[in-house]
């Protein structure tokens, strides 16, 4: 494990929390859900993080590094495919495009990705940190199935789950990596 191992989790975590607070605030302040389109910035931050990480690539790429990278590539494709499929089905069924389903599915994808990374890295705290996100996924999906209200609080719940599932594990991972490097 190298110093900065948790940085990608921190980049995504802090960006998502900031975005959830900004979008929620704009919706509350303006009373207009058009600001929900701000979530599309999530698709823009991926290439920025990848570009920022490009200069930090290690000289030796381990099997673990490749596996973790592959896990996130698969989930990245799932995000994109989910977005395209939701839009396509809305057009197919002649419905207005509503991406609210992206919120619980994104939590599910990110939670699974973090848990799988925890399994690969053998870090129990990382395996189980997405439980908060999973509980919120079930809550959101049940609310959608039962035609419950989708409120601006969902965006804040989304941000909160990223604190628990990405920011905290990112800091713990960096601390462990730094401690391990100091031993060597």
Feature-to-residue mapping (PLM):
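Helical transmembrane-bundle signal
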Residues: 16-23, 43-47, 83-86, 107-117, ...
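Membrane-water interface of alpha-helical transmembrane segments
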Residues: 2-10, 33, 69, 97-104, ...
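Membrane-proximal helix-loop-helix units in multi-pass membrane proteins
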Residues: 75-134
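Structural signature of hydrophobic alpha-helical transmembrane segments
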Residues: 34-45, 93-108, 156-160
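Selected alpha-helical membrane-embedding segments in polytopic membrane proteins
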Residues: 2-91
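Terminal transmembrane helical module of multi-pass membrane proteins
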Residues: 116-184
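Hydrophobic alpha-helical transmembrane segments
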Residues: 22-29, 89-94, 114-121, 139-147
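C-terminal ends of transmembrane helices
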Residues: 49-66, 112-121, 167-174
């Amino acid at each position: 494990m190298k110093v900065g191992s948790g940085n990608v989790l921190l980049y995504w975590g802090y960006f998502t929390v900031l975005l959830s607070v900004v979008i929620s605030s704009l919706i509350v302040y303006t009373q207009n859900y058009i600001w929900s389109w701000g979530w599309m910035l999530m698709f823009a931050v991926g290439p920025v993080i990848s570009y920022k990480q490009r200069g930090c690539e290690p000289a030796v790429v381990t099997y673990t590094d490749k596996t973790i990278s592959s896990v996130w590539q698969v989930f990245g494709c799932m995000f994109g495919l989910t977005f395209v499929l939701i839009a396509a089905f809305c057009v197919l069924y002649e419905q207005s495009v509503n991406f609210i389903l992206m919120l619980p599915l994104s939590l599910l994808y990110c939670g699974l990705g973090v848990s799988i990374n925890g399994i690969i890295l053998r870090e129990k705290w990382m395996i189980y940190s997405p439980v908060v996100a999973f509980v919120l996924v079930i809550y959101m999906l049940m609310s959608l199935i039962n035609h419950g209200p989708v409120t601006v609080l969902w965006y804040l719940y989304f941000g909160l789950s990223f604190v628990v599932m990405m920011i905290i594990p990112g800091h713990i991972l960096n601390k462990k990596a730094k401690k391990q490097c100091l031993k060597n």
